[in-house]
Each structure stands twice: as structure tokens, then as C-alpha cells.
Amino acid sequence: MIKKNLFKDFSRFSFVQSSIKNNVRCHSKLKLVQPFFIKTKQERNKKFLSSYKFSEIQLITIDLASPEKIKEWAEKKLPNGKIFGQVTNPNTLHYKTLKPLKGGLFCERIFGPIKDFECACGIQKQKPFNRIISFQNKQFCSKCDIEYTWSDIRRYQLGYIQLVTPVTHLWYLKGMPSYIRSVLGAKKKHIEAIAYCSEIVTIDQAWKPNRLIPFPETISSVALSSKKRNTFVNKEIVNIQLTYNNFKKFNVNNTRSLYVSINKKLFKKQFSNNSYNCTCVDNEIQNPIFFLKYFNINFLKPQNLKELKVLYINPDFYKVENYPYKNQVKFEFYQKICRSFIKTSLNNHKPIYALNYLSHSFLNSKVKIFSHFEHIDIHTMYVFNEEILINRFSNLARLKKNGKSKKKIGYIHSKKIHININKHLLYFKNKKLKNLQLSNNLKLIIIISNNASLNYFKNWSNTFNCMNTLILKMQFVNKKLHFQYYRSFFNTHTIERVYFNFFSLDYLKNSNFFVNFSKLLALNLLKFMKSNLFNIFIIPIPTILDNFIFKLSLDSQFQRLLNSLSIQKQKVLNSNSVISKSNKIFKKQFFIKNFSLYDEAIEILWQRFWKFGYYFTSNNMNNKLCKIITKFNKNNNGLRSTLPSWLKLIKKLIKKTQIDKKSNQNLLNFRVNVIHTNTQNKFSLFVNLIKIYLKKVLFLFQIAPENIKNIYIKKSIFIFQELRNKNFKYRNFRTQIKKIVIKLFGLELLPWVLSQFIFTSKIFYQFQKSKFSFYHNSNFLTFSRRHSGRNLIKKIKESSFLNFQIGVNNINTIFHYKYSFNCLPSCHIPNYKCRQKFFIYKNKIENILKLKKFRLFFNIWLSRFLKNNISVLNVVVNLKLNNINSNNLQTLNLLFYQKKWLLKKKQIFYNYAMLKEFHSKLLIVGTLHDFSNFIKLIYSSSYKNETLINIFSIQIQPFYKFNFIQKIRKYLNSEYYNSFDSGRTKHYLRKFLNKDSDNLFFKQFNYVYYFILFSSIISTQTIERGSLTSLNNQQFFLNLLCFFKLAKKNIFKKYSWLTSIQKYFYSRQIIKYKKKQQQKSMLKFVKKKTFFNKFLDLINSFIYDYQKRLKLLKKHSIIQLILKKKMYIFYFLKKLQNKLINEIQKYYFYEFEKKKFINIEFNLNNFKNIVIFMNLKKKILFLNSVLFQSQTNFFNKHANLNIFNNSYNYMYIDFNNFLSIGQFWQILINIFKNKINKYYLLSRSLPFIISNDYVKIDPLIKKFHDDLKHQVCFNSFLIKLTFYNSTLLYPLQNIIKNNNKVLQTRQQYYKIIKSNNLFLTNYFKKIRGNFTELSIKKFENIHTIVSCIGYFGYQDILYHQIRELKKNDYFRNFYLKFIKHDLSNNFNEAIFSVISESRISYNDSIFWNNIYSLSNRYSWKSDIELNIFLCYMLSPETPSDILIPLYKQRIHSSNVLREEPPIAGGGIILKLLKELDLPEMKKIDIQLQTILKKIPNKLHEIEVLLKHNQTNLKLLKYYSLKRRTVIEIEKSILRKLKYIRRLNWVSAKPEYMIIRNLPVLPADLRPIFKIQQQLTASDLNRLYQKVIYRNDRLKRFLKNSTTSNSFEMLFAQRMLQEAVDNLIENGKDINSIETDSRGRPLKSLGELLKGKKGRFRQNLLGKRVDYSGRSVIVVGPKLKLHECGLPIEMAIELFLPFLIKEILKNKYALTVRSAKIYIKKHRIKITQLLRQVVKRQPILLNRAPTLHRLGIQAFLPKLVEGKAILLHPLVCSAFNADFDGDQMAVHVPITNEARIEAWKLVLSRNNLLSPATGEPILLPSQDMVLGCYYLTIENLQSLTQKKFRINRKILNQRNYIFSDFEKIFIAYQRNQINLHTNIWVIFNNTIESDSILQEPTEIQVLFSGQYIKVYSDYYQKFNRNGKIYNQVVRTTPGRILFNLMLNNCFN
């Protein structure tokens, strides 16, 4: 700051603060008596060891002092607890005794004792010997509270006056410049008027300068109010914390949840044809994750907003968006929605709210108009936005045609349009689909390039209507554009993504799919083949079907297609057609160049159908195969281009090779089919893989490679046909072969290939028996018609080949799984959360699990659950953590690309399927979650030292007694099993299970852990013994028993499992018993241990006979059973959970922010144990629920962990999907679909079935909160509890408020109400009344359940729809009756009367809201609070608002409505300054910068206009005025920027410019003393007294309520302001000067500081300084400008340390003392050394007074004799020096920084111009001017009248002519001429002379044509052409000398 500001800061007692190294904060008010000797000896030694404390000097800062800091300086606390420091009494001394008065301006308690170590009582203490010791133990008088210390303390001890209302600081208000004015951006007179209470400020006035916008419509507009409209959000929004702590006067949460959305201006852009932004389709289908935006905006961090592309659509949007093309929209349903949506939004005049979609496709595509949902689940989510997108899609072509309309539209189209249609849309749109059962997450995705015309879409919509499959359709018209686009598309995605990631395969659950599929196939293929445009038509390969049926159906379709195409049509499709051409172009330009793996993709597709291929090559089918091939060959030319290229592989099925039986009779007999692939491809990964595995096979069979030459054909695919047992030598051979096959088909390259592998041909024969031969034209169609729907499923199930009915995707799943398939009826179909990767596994496992993390994790579990369980220890045999070698795991790609087996930057998912070996004919596949078969070993390069991180997926499976397990193991260890008849099994089961079922005894859970990496089990020996087999079967049975245990607890589970368990016992292929005895014992065993029979008949009747089931429901009361079962609630194992979170924070996430939970969600859907799953690739952390069973209830919870990083805004964790209830719902849906209601999909309604008992949730959440509160900061208002899609919101504040105990009076109970006749709605809500009702379906006789939320939120059911049941009733009364009617007797308390202690009636207390009253003078602490309050109060009604029947005032404390002092004067300015916190200042900074950038353009425009309007005076005047104002604005903005940035740099806040605590100067600095028997007092005491008097007066006014708002009060406040002003600077305002009795103005603080005798100049600046000297200055004319002469004596003294250093360095002396002696003795040597030192060392010269910055300049010293400093005469004017005895001071800069600054900044030759005026300051004067004049004078005699003695001889000679200058100087040195002799010299350069403009005196013309012009000073000779060739000039030697000197200077 400039010196003036420095004075001001000092005057505010913002004393110099220096932070010293040892973290002691030290202020300059510290007493001189109190130095730093107080510290310990060590610290003291440290201090004195350092040579100098320059670093500490650098740390000194000058700040504004806060009121708290002033208070801290002034106050001192006594041992008895009393605090002194505040001056309350205006009196000074007693008039008689002259002793200080208590609490007054000289009080000894505040300022210290008058005499050393003597108190007011007169008691003296002995003075200490050492003054320092006294500060260690302070002593006080117990009577008068005065400290025993030195009286010097009165010179340093401050006091303070506490002002009633804040007062502005005079210098910051009225100073020049006025800081307060420029920071607030208001006019000075306005702010002064406010400060001096001459104007009253209303809300509007306070509002206007800060807010340019009208009243806010949304809270988000409040949050973003200060940002500039066109700039991006993520630069400007800083973290705004809006929690309920900000709202002390009202509680927003009680009526409704407040939601915040981010608004962002939508830019208007035209369509750019060339921009093809290819979106990432990896997560295309994954359900976009959303969250409720409660009242915490901590997700608005800038780094997160990069991904949060939420659009804000202007209200103007509606004017543009008239939907002019709605007649073109095919779907009436969409029209309705659009209309209703637009109507509602138009009526309310509100903006649409944007919902953030985090799936990548929506992040990147710019067409986003989503509603902002209050509460939503995954079912309702898509409905709104898809219809909007479809509407856009239908309008697209028109928009492109009408170029004009582009500019008007305010939204952006992306180049691709995604249409996601979920089940509701499909259902409502298409009546044909009403019989279908659509899975929960079915979506149709169509990706269409922009070139699709509307007509084409119309034609295509017919197929669209019946479409139940998924299509990827891409068009190619403009070749270059599209190839470029397609290229980028394929480059960015792997094969697998291209073919599969667009598609959700859930629809395959639908039984009718097979019927419709073939029709669609034929339709589409024909259509696409006929179209002129080339279309790629890719059909997703249904993994669940194992592609068998699908493949056959395709073949039949193509055969039909070939037959149906006539020859004429084939001619159309000949090689000249558009299609074939484009196909060629496409293949050339795209696949060959850019997608080298295309052929591999073809091979992969072929591999997908390997079973079909196997079937093909069996002996029965060879003839058919030949027929097909011949047919294809006939049509080869015509159809080559259009058929999918993988069918070409069939054409090239050429060779079958057999190994010669004679050469290897004892060995394997098998066939190999070789398929030639496209020869264009140079390299095939798959072929190489096959070669490697074939080598292994050959090695196993001991076959020489020569015998199988035919197999080694390049570009070949290898297919196993048959393996027979006859010729095998070894028992374990088949398992070895299976391993190889599994490896072959379990590659990472082929993630969708099933791991199961069927070797025998029996199954195919079974298929033939079941009429599964589809090779003829219509076989498949006839078969599928005959066995439509579930019959087909049954057939396939019975064949034990595949099962695709059970639980492909559960209803409750939010995540979509890409790969879902089933291997056996007994297995659950695995639901994959991530891509499953298969890896090769070597036999030996060593050293993978050395990590502490796993040990820690494992030991917790082991110690807790495995201690007493011997069987478990048997299972976990040899699990040594150091036995596993990481080198034995690797991906297949590494096999070829790296010779070494290294793990680098790959996630490893280790699949159990590798290890499962069975003697049975089928292989069970291990899955990700079920049966704990899956271990995830995660490896990532982002961790330190590239270590392997292991997090195990452990599933705890409950089972029973130890002997029970032993029996199972014995039973399973038997080697062979025989099949048994399914009917007999059923009979046995029923017979045995009906007995003794009630006598079952269930013990508590035990827990088993299955780890897959067993070190010793996996070896050839164990495989031979068959122990691995037993392990796997045991695994299955344990899981089976888990079911029985769970089934007892939860009936839901039973439904889902029973069918599969029955199948397990009935199926032939799965278990084969060796003997009937074993069979019987097993059945008995099962009978004893289960209560299976209890529900068997029930379930059968439930499934097969719906009518009977209805009666059974009433008799057996299943629903009651269900409802009686309470929710089992798991909770976290505290230790493990803490450790887990800590581990994750330490090792895994660098960005992981502790204590950041956006939202806590509890999910009660699963009754499951732990799965911890981390996908570090996407940085998503999944923490599943909880880890063990307690004796109390279970609670399964999940939290939204907020991990801030670039890719995701928050964490979303959901674990709905393990052994979830989804399968139960699946069965029920099948039943209900067929029996109850064909017109509605029940997946939405069924989840409402829930417990009839209430759940006491408070203690559970309390427990959860206590567990997590140390790790997590709960920022959200509510906790979301999810019960099967119905959501309860729980207010977290109840817990936070009462951390110690839960309030018993207001415990929350949640009653789940059931109703027999209720409207269920599929709906969604939008905040601002944009409500669209999608469907209302009525259900009768179905027990549906609605969740009611007590007092804090919205309902799941729309109450205005419930009201429609009885329209006549008043809504509240009806609803109360409705609830009362259905309340059961279980409730001990009235559940909903949670409001008051003194309850109102039970009926009246369901919905309530608090009444909070605000004082009419209530002032908001910040602008944003007022905005939010207004936003909340003024928000319009929405259909989802609930009527609040009554209000309850709940403010009991009188303190809340206490009268606050009114705000006036400085208080208002304080309020305004308080709003300028750091985030706000940053925003202002950005805003000012943006304005500044525009100003130059504005000025340029004005300049241009000024030039154009030179003639028009009016305009000229107007624009010049405008220019002046713009320049003024620029100056004021720059000034404001400077202050704001300065405030940002220092720790001071703007509000510190307002005084709340006025410091009182120490008593000795304003003394009262006697002079000649009279008392003389300092003027300051009078001024302080005035302040105290006026402060007390204002206090009295404010205490009295009658005067607290009066004009008297305002006047008193003004008087206080003036008193403080006069104290700081008396006389600033002429009207309010304080004077003494003589009328002389009193001296204020300002006068003490300023002036020559002021505190700074006299006391601080006028001190002696080290390394300085002083001497008289003398002129040094021979010096250069940057040099000065320094006397040698002075130089030796100044540079003494440097000299000594040099002496010691050169070893002239050994010690410092001897060096000093050396200096005295050896003077000559020392001067030499000194000259070396001085060369590189500048010095600073200063002449007092230093009035401007040129008063100190740096020079290079030159050593001179004498005692005076030599100074260059030109420098004198800068110093204002002359040589009449002036003195100057010399200073030596010591540090390197000071020297650098001396050289660069203050060197004299760098200061040639005056900094004030810019004029040159080094002007010659006196002697220099005289010398110049003397040199250049022409006539010496004209100098004076007095005649000099002149050499007459020289003077009279006037005819000297010289040819050059050298001869002139030679003549001058010989004394032939003097300086003033007139001479002539030949000089051909240009000259200046008076006679140039005159006429020549004569012209001489020669006969040769040359001529001479003669002037008085020179003459010129010209040639014939008139060019000068010679010039002779008359001058003097002095002038020549001067000219040469000037030239030398310039050159």
C-alpha cells in the first residue's frame, strides 16, 4: 500500500504482524521490555545461531485488524476469571487524589500500575533482579485486581471501547480514494448518506446495486445470480454450502423438500454439417444414474461441472417451440404428452428444469430436455425424455429443409439421435404387444444418421410398430462424410461393443419373442435388400439362447429369401447395382484400412454358433449341408454383397480331415473341420490361438505334427466334433481336454462365448427327438407356433440344454447387465455388472496374495466366523497367502504380444469356471455373484509401485450342523451317480417331505467362505482323485441348503427358488445316483433338514391354478404370512467398515474426499450378505451391504459415496441384484400376466406388497448414523429408504439435532397401508407444475400397498387422484378416514401424530407444518438467504402439492423473537460488506475482467464513430462524452479490481473497514500531567470521552422500544459516527470540528501520525542504520552517469565484512581479529582488495528529504582520496542537490535481492525521466551550458565588453582551408589556430545554416559548364547536370569538436 494507506492501517491499530518461524504470532504492540527471551533455552540458541533474520523481516505484513483481534490485544484474563480491557467509564482521574478511576480512560486494571510493582491498595512487591523473569508468572492483587509489573506497561497496553452499532472508518469512507465506495460500487455521496443516517435504506435499495436480475424464480438462479449469463457454469460456481444450518428462523424441510437444479444458458447454434461427434456407446444401455437434488449444492464444484452438462432452457424457448410439425408425428400417444407438457409449461411461464444424465451417451449428445423430477424410480424415468426425443426426431427432416427456422430454435441437435423407448411406451403405443411380457429394462434403441428423410421414416414405422427386437441401422449416402464418421465409430470401440452394447438382451425372457422374431427377420431383410441405400443390418446375438435356435432360424429365413427372390430381382441385385458398388467401397475404404480385425469379427460370429457347426458336421447332417452350400453357390453372384459376410464361411466349408486311425490306433479318434476365411487378412489372432492349443492337444495325445498337416492351414478355424472314451489311456484325459476347450472358448477376445462345453452328441439327439431340426424352410416357424410361449421354454428346459426363464434380470435391478446367460436349470443366470473376462490359469499358484490388505480382510472374517467350524477349515485347506504366484495369471492377448507372462495395466477377473471339473456330462459355470465363485483381483497402474490389489468377493452362505455337512460331503464324494426317474423323485420328495416337517430345528447361522485360489487342490493328483468334483458339488448343495434356511425367514425367496430346486431334483443330466440306497438316504436326509413340503402344494396351486389360488390365499392367508414377516435389517460391522473406508482412502482413491456423502440411501430390497466390488477402471466404488448377522433385525444399507473426480459426479451404489426377490416377482408376473390382467404390466405394482407391521426405523438409522458419522459428513436433509420401488424419505436432522438420544416423543413410525380398491399410477413429477399423467390403471382384488410418509415429504401416490374416489368428501377428512379405516390394531400409538407433546386429535395431525414468524424489522444475514426464502414462499402450486390441514406453532423459546437492534448507519454498510466473502469476491473479479475485456472494443467503436461524424457537432459532442464515461468506467473497474485482489491476498475481510471495537491508545501516550500547578491533558482524552458519552446515549435509545426506531436514535447514531471521525482525524468535516475552550481544534490521532514530527517520520524513520555512512558531496565531472566517488576510508568501514571475507579467503589472516589488524597495516593491499569488492557491489545514495522515488538512487562506487563523496553534476537535479555543502547518505544493499533491485530498478542511468511528469530530469546546467556555449561561439570578442589579450596574428588570418578534420586539430595543437578561428573545411554531408533559405551572394559559371554558388557561410560546386560534387563550409574548430563529441555519444 502507499504510505498514506499505511498510516491509515496503522491508525486502526492493525498493528504489524510478523509470523515467526517457530509459529509464534508476534505483534508490534509487544512491549520493548518483553523481547523473545521468554522462550526455552533451545529456542533461544536457535534464534541466535542464525546470522540474520531477513526471512522474518520478509514475513512482516500490515493488515486490517478484525474486531476480535483488537479485543484480543486489549483484554487480559485474571486467574480468578475476571476479564479487563473494555473502557466503560469516560472519566479519567479523581479530581482530588489524581488517581485513575475504575474502568476509566486511565484505569490501572486495564492499562497497568502507575508505579512499578505497586497496586492501588498501596501494597508493594519486591522487584525482580532480572526484568524478564517477571513475565513468566503474572501476579495480581486479590483486592483491586491490578497486576504487579513494571509501570512501563502503560506505554504499550491497549484498551477498547465496544460500540453499540458499527461505525465506518473515516479514512476508508472519505479518503481519496474511498475504498468502501469502490468495493461496493456505489456513489460516495450515497454511502456517506447511509453512514450518517441522512437516508433510510429499504430492501429494494439494498437489493438493486447487488442484483441485476428480478426476483428469482428458482433457487439455482440465486446460486448463479452473480455469474455472467454467457459464461460457462463450471468456471464460476464455487462450492455453495446450503444446509439447514443457514436457516435459523424457518425450517424448509418440514413442508417439502427443496430441490436445486443448475441453470445454464442454452446457446443458439446452427447445425454444422461436418461435425460428427461420435458418442461413446460403451455405457449406452446402462440406466442413467440420477439422484434427488436436496438442499446441498456441494456437488457444484467446478471440476465436477465439466461432466455435468445440464442445459437451462430460456422461457423464450416456448415462443419458438410451437411444435408446428405435430401432425407429422405418427404416434398419437407422444402427441398427447407433448401437448400436455407444452401447455402446462406455457401456462405457468416457468422454465423447464434439466435433469443431469450421467450416462455417456447423454453427456455427449446435446439434445437434452429432461424434466426435473422430485421423486422418481427407474421405471418412470425414461418416459418423458424419450417422447421429447422422438418428437425431435420426427421434426428433424423438416427443420433441415427450412433453413430459416434453424436460427430461431434455441436448442441444439446432435448429429445422432437416440430414441430409447421403455416398456410403457411400447405398451401404450402398440396394441399388438399387449400379450407380451416385457422385461423391466427393455429399451429400443435406434441410431439413425441425420440424412434419414421423414418419408423413409414413415415407411419404416410399420416395422417399428411390431418391432420387439433391436436394430442397429446405419445409412451411407454421402460417402466421405459417412466413412469418416463410421471409421471413428469403429476405431473407438471393440468388436464386442459394436455388436452388443447397443442392445438390452432382456427381451429374450419374453416367450412370444420367438414367434415374432422370425416374422421381423424376414420383413426387415427383404425390406433392406430392396432399398437403394446400402444398409448394414446387424442383429444382436441372443446369448441366452446359446445362439442355436437363432442360427437355425436365420438359415431358414435366408433359404426362404432365396426361394422368394425371383430371377428378375436377382438381376436388380447384380454386380452393377448401387448396393454392390457401395458394398465394395465400404469394404475397401473402411474395413480393410481401418478395421483390420473385421475378419476376426466374422470368425467370432461364427464361433458364436459353434454348436450349430458341430451339429452341422455330424454324419446325419452332411447331406443337408451340401444342399445348402450348393444352393448358396448357385446364387453366389447375385447375393454375395447383400448376405451377411459370415454366411460366406458356410460356403467355404470345404475340407474334413481325419487322423489316420492306423497310425494312432490307441490314441484319440476325432475330426477337425477347417473353414477357410477371407484370404485378404494377413493376421488372425484366433487362428494363432487355435494353433497353440492344437499343439497342446497334440502333445497330450502324443501325435506327431506330421500326421495332422491338414490342420495347419492358415486362416483356419478349429472345431471339436467328438471325443470318445474308448481310446483314452488316462483317466484324467477328458478333464484335461475340457480345460483346453474352456480356455479356447473362454478367451478375453470372446467375452460372450459360453464357458460350458458339451462333448457328447446325446444332447443333439435329444434335440432331434424334441423336433428341434430346423433345416427345412418352415420347420422352425411351425415348431415355434406349435410350442409357443412357455411350452417352448419347458421343452428346452427338459432337454437340460438351456434355461432362460428364471431371473435374467430382476425387477428391482437398476443396473443393466450386458451378458446374461444360463447353463443349467439349477444354476441362476449370472447377472454381470461388468464385462466378464476369462483368463488362463496355470497349475501352480504362488505369491499373488502377499498384501497386508487381504490378510487384514481375511483375518477379520476368519477369526469371527471360522474359529469353531472344522468343516470350513477343511474347505479352506492350505490357503496360504504367500503360495500364489502372479506370473500364473495372464490375459490371452499377452500370450502373443508378450513372451513373458506379465500382468500390466489389466484388471483381472478370475473366473471360477476355469477350475470347475465334473465327471458329469455338463459343466456348471461359475458366476459373478452367485455361490461366491468369483474372485476379483484388481490391478491398476494408478497405484504406487504397481502392486496388485486384491478385494475378494466373499459371499457368506449359511448352513447347518457339522454332521450335516459331513453327510453331504460323504454323499458327494461318491464317484458315480446314476440317473433316476423324475416321476419317482417327485413321489419320493412328496412322500418324505410331508412328514415331520414341523420338528425341524434351525440353529443360528454359521458362515462359510469359499476362496477360489486354493494352492494345493488344483493339481493333477487332486483331479485324479476327484476331490475337486466333490468340492464343487458340495458348493452347490450348501447353497441349496442356504435357500432352505432363508426360505424359513422369508417366503419371498421360496417362490423364486422352488421351481429351480424341483428341476434340480428331477433332472436326469445333473445328478446321477450310483445306487438306490444312496438315493433314498439322500431323500431322507433332505426330508429331515427342510420344510420344503410346507409350501410345495401351495406353490403348485399358486402357479397352475389361479382361481383356486385366490381361495387358498384367503384360507392359508399367505399374504398375512408375508406381511407378518418383519423386515430383516443388516447393519455394518463397525470395525471392518471403518478399516475398509480407511484402506480405500489410503491406497485406492487419491481424489476420494472423506466426509462427502451427497445422499444416504438405504435399500431394504435384499436379504443378502457382503459383496465388495470395485471397478477401479471407472473409479466407481461399490460397497455392498453388510457383513454379518446379528441377533437383532437386519438392515441392508447402501450409501452414495461422493468421490470427486473428472468422470463422475458422485457415487451411486446399488446392490439389488444378488439372490434377490426379482425371481419371485418374475414368476408372479408370469402368472398375473396370463391370468389377471392382460392390459397392464404388473412389474410396477407388485413391489408394493410389503409388511403389514410397521418398522421402527429411528433406532436403526441412529445406529447407522453413529457408525458413519466419523467417516462421513451428512450433508443431506433426508435419508432415502427404499422398499421395493416405494421410497420413504427420512429427515436426517432428527438425528443430527439429538446426537445423544433419539427423541422418544417424536419417534417416526412408518405405516404401510393396504387398500383393496386403489388407483396405482405410473407417473412422474416436475417441480414447476409440468405434470404429465401417463396412465392410471385400476386393479381389483389385488393387495397393493402404498407407502405413506408422515410429516416431511411428498407421497409416492398422487393425492389428487386418490381424492377422485370420493369426490364429495373434503379431501382431508376423506384421507383421514381412509387411513383410519385401514389402520390395524398393532399400533400402540397413533402413528402419524408425531407433532406435538400435547397431542391434538389423532385425526387432525397427519400433515402439518410449522408456523414461523419473522419480525417486520428482521434483516437477512445475506442476500442469498432472502432470495431462498422468497423463492420458497413465492413458488407456485403444483399438482403434487399436498394440502396442509393445520399448522402448529413450535417456537417455544422467547429468545427467537427477541428484539434485535435496528440496522442503520454503519450497520447497513457492514451488511453489504459481509456479503463480499471470498467466493463472492472471486465472482466479482471474474465479472469485472469480462467487462474490462469488452471496453477496448467499445472504445474502438466510439473512435470510429467520432471519425465518421466530424461534421455533425451534436453527435461529435455526444460520442466524446460517451468516450469519457467509458474511460472513467474503465478506471473505476481497474481500481475496484485492485482493491478486491488486494483483499484476496491478505487475510483481511472488507467488513474490517467498519469499526465495532474502537481501540484506546495506551495511557502514557495521552498523558495528564502538572505544569506550574495546573493540569494539562492530551486532546485525545477529550475525544475518547466524547465517543464514550455518545455511545452510552445511543445505548439508552436502543433499550427503550419507543425510541429504538425514532429519529432521535438515528441522530444519536450520527453523533457517534462524528465522534469517532473526530477521534481519527479532527477537522476533516468542517461542520463537526471538536475545539478546546479557545476555539482551537483538538489534536486527533491523525495529527499524531502525519508530518515531520509525526510518529513515522520522527520516531520510526529517523533511526540509525547499519552499513551506512554520510558525507558532503562534491562535483565529479569526470565520472560517468552511473558512477560516484566513494572515499577510501568510508569504503573500508562500509565493506568491512566483505573485506574480511576476502582476507580470510586469500589466507592473509586466519581470524577476524587478525584480519582487522591486517587492514590497518597493509593499506595498499587493502585498496586493491577493496577495488575488487566494489566492482560488483552497488551502493545507494540518498539525500534528505526524500520527496519522491528518485531521492534514492544506486551507483557504482569508484574509490577516491579525500573525505567527500563525488557526484555527477547531471544527477543533482533528481536529488535536488547542489554543491554548497549538501550532505548525502550512503547505504550498502546486502542481500542478493536488494542488489538485483539496485541494478535493475534504482540505477541512476535507468532514471532519466521524471516518474511524475515524464519529462527528462537529467538536464545540463551552469558550467555545462557555459562550456557548450564557449565551444560553439563564433566571435570571441562579442562575449564581453572587456578586451582579452588575443593573439592578433591568429585572429587576422581568415583564409585557412582544410581538407579534413584531422588537419584542423593538428594545426590547433601547433597553436596555429585557436578554438574561435574562422576556417574553411571541405564537408560534403548535409549542413544546417541560416543562409540556406537566402539567395547566394554570387554565382560563378565556368566555361566547362560547371558552376559555383557562393553563400556567406559556405559555397557549393555543381557539375553540368546540376549535381553537387564539392562543398566548402566556414566554421570554427570549437564547433567541429562539439559536433564530433555529439556523434561519438550517439554512435
From Swiss-Prot:
The UniProt record lists the keyword Plastid:
yes
One GO term (biological process): DNA-templated transcription
Q: Which reaction does it catalyse?
A: RNA(n) + a ribonucleoside 5'-triphosphate = RNA(n+1) + diphosphate
> Where, in this chain's numbering, is Mg(2+) bound?
D1778, D1780, D1782
Which SUPFAM superfamilies does this UniProt record tie to the protein? Answer: beta and beta-prime subunits of DNA dependent RNA-polymerase
Q: Which residues form a coiled coil?
A: none
Q: Spell out the protein name for this chain.
A: DNA-directed RNA polymerase subunit beta'
User: What is the originating organism of this protein?
Assistant: Oedogonium cardiacum
Q: Which gene encodes it?
A: rpoC1
